[in-house]
């Protein structure tokens, strides 16, 4: 069964620079077969979320995602939530 990752975090500095680094991260992951979305809260422009649906192998995804975040200096604390279909 596949799962969807919802990863949310706060952005407290240059939104444009962080958005560019996140776009590069998501392009790399999409090329590896894990397309994602970048969202932000409607009522808080500093709270953002990455969403990656249909992850078949969570450990393989995390083994690619976490180092890719570090390479792009996306080291802010994040909250990972994994959901699957009922």
Role assignments for model-derived ranges:
Residues 1-63, 74, 80-86:
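Short S/T/G/P-rich N-terminal loop/turn motif that feeds into the first structured element of a domain
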Residues 69-71:
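Short, exposed beta-strand-loop hairpins at the edges of beta-sheets
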């Amino acid at each position: 069964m596949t799962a969807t990752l919802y990863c949310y975090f706060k952005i407290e500095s240059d939104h444009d620079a962080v958005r560019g680094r996140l776009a590069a991260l998501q392009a790399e992951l999409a090329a590896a077969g894990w397309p994602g979305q970048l969202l932000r809260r409607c009522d808080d422009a500093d709270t953002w979320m990455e969403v990656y649906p249909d992850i078949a192998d969570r450990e393989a995804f995390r083994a690619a995602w976490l180092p890719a975040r570090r390479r792009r200096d996306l080291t802010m604390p994040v909250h990972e939530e994994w959901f699957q279909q009922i």
